């Protein structure tokens, strides 16, 4: 009897070809996903940002604090440096957050803390609100030095908002000067506004500097408030954080965004 090896080979070959085709498709699909992700993170791409996790009710706030060299100067009318005054003003925001989470335990608040000068440091990535953890991160704020890289800070913190798992996303910047290092903040703010399709709101507090430098924010759904003293800085931060961010987040959060 003649051995039936050719039939056996054909029987083995068909599944092997199927495996190869599936593997090739998976590799191609993976490359496509990688290219798509790269496009979303490429400043020159028009691809919209995509959430990296499923999103639900809540708000994520990335707080960006200027630690450039000029922040070592005394705050107007104060014997303390602008760096220390800003640190204390941000810490004062925690009282408002405590009150909010007590009143609305059903509405998740996530906060991240970043510093920027000629480089950007993530002191605490965006995580569920924890007063002690944020105070600990504030204590690690780098000493002032270097240039002012506002645009780079916006671009660095933005992706963390899309890992937070909440619909409402905010960038809150405290700075005492104009950009002197890296990407221009106006270009980055416009990029974020366009590619987030308005989902990311950007707010600035111009501390001991003219808010007119950041007037472009009003064109991209954000805002800027000037503050000349430590007291004004606290008032400005409270106005933005409590009066705008928390109020807007809850109002928008009552209505889940339409699925695309």
Stretch-by-stretch model annotation:
Residues 141-147, 151, 177-239:
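VWA/integrin I-like adhesion module and closely mimicked acidic/polar interface patches used
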Residues 14-24:
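Bacterial N-terminal signal peptides
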Residues 226-260:
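C-terminal "exit" segments of structured domains
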Residues 2-16:
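Bacterial N-terminal signal peptides that target proteins for export
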Residues 50-51, 71-84, 120-125, 138-147, ...:
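Second-shell loop/turn segments in exported
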Residues 54-124, 153-154, 170-174, 209:
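Von Willebrand factor
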Residues 27-76, 128, 155, 254-255:
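Acidic, polar low-complexity linker/tail segments
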Residues 74, 100-140, 150, 160-164, ...:
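Short beta-strand-loop
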